[in-house]
């Protein structure tokens, strides 16, 4: 493939960001693509092209309606909405494409018509203008082969609703010019999308999963109703296949794409005739269900799981996509609760093999694995790893959760470090976050709510969550945290345990645990006071009142060693820091310390939220006791125990409940 790094932003693109974009096709997904681009790049000039004035008028009205709704919901200011609607026009004239640096076709799945469209586009745009198609199934080699400059063209497959769904497949085909795919990945990542690179196979990666999932559901109609199938399918997805087909008017799509796959790869992919004759399916809405006989439910469950396994191993065996992108794409783009590989891992290789064996017996011709199923499961799902000048750059990638930590993620980070910390070719490590919004938005609550009220189990939970951090404390090779965006809670605690911190200028830090009625249990009450004693008053405010700290302020205080303008510069600076720190010993953090006495405060957060007096008292006691501890290990243990104590308070129950219910906590009734 033409891509250089797993993290799209490690190296700066050689092309500028788009300034003038045209989208051909104003009737369906095209306007949504346009709204996403204008929301991310308000200064962009956007042209919507269509053959029907009515479609253009409706698209412009939809665009304005999206902006109006965003303002009404508090997602956008009036000024931002005005910028999103500025420099947006519609046209019937292809001559208006002149001067565009990117043209996206989202008009048709007819190959001949696509080729005619791109011939018309090439006649009007500069030779270096980028040209892409939003096709969900047609290979780039077929679409662009007749172009004069095919090297500037590829497929960028968006998912509905394109203004909100972050996933986009970027097709790395042999005709793509050097740097094209990487540039598009960079553009998408900078504008909030999740680019997933695939090869130029028919239907690419995610449509292979979704279309065959739906076609298999259609094959089950000989024994079950659409409602029964959707009910069982919700083991895997938030909305069943027939509900989604109704929503997307997707029956013709299944006919089209599975016919293409059948013609290309075999009759076992032929679409079920029922998709040609049914307009809408009778099926329950998400969150509701119908009764299904247990035996029938088992049959449906095995068939649906079987097609997921079959398609997944085929995608990986043929190199159509990566295992990490497959799982993440299924969750983010298609609404699966777990990716196929994640489901297989949780189910166990033996049970997955049973399901697959049954599926292949019932569906001869469908893909079978070339390796033992267990071999497909040995992959990282939440981090990306790149090698930059002898430094391992670890990128936290859970964009749907702002890169929040999970047990799996910390285990994967630790695994990368353990594998390479004794490798002489590796100088050290950089830890950064995916995208531009977040380094890490804290730790997922995970199973913590089940531990409320259990002091010892909660303290042990904090110890378990600290395995990676304690390992970082003892490392000889340097680890540098590169803050590409916000660092909250456990994410900031992770960064604090790295040898050095660097940040982009607009990054910021916060310890919001007190607003949940709990304490930060994995080092925040201990480490910052020992590493940066001059900033003790700042940490007092961050811990007790959830005060924010900007990267610029952290730089002035010496917490952040340097600031960068953007992510590529940030990673380069972090790598340079690693190399400069290589061989140097870390400053020991043992010994009692004497921070300034904690000042009396009102129990009110920096944002005005009333806080729990009891939680603040527990935190203040822990900070004092930890400061007096003779070793770092003893100080950390005080923090673990204090976290356990906080888990037994009424404030913790209220704070965690409020978080889950998406409301403000009321600590007035808890103390």
Where are the model-predicted features located?
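Conserved CoA-thioester-binding segment of acyl-CoA-metabolizing enzymes
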Residues: 373-436, 456, 460, 470
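Glycine- (often His-adjacent) and acidic-residue-rich active-site loop
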Residues: 433-468, 487, 515-517
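Glycine-rich beta-to-alpha active-site loop
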Residues: 33, 470-516
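N-terminal glycine-rich phosphate-binding loop for ADP-containing cofactors
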Residues: 1-389, 397-400, 408, 451-453, ...
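Acidic, divalent-metal-coordinating active-site segment for phosphoryl/phosphodiester hydrolysis
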Residues: 489, 546-553
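Terminal peptide-recognition signature
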Residues: 394, 398, 412-413, 431, ...
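Short helix- or helix-capping micro-motifs
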Residues: 441-443, 528, 538-546
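Redox-cofactor binding/interface segments in oxidoreductases and associated redox assembly factors
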Residues: 104-105, 133, 432, 481, ...
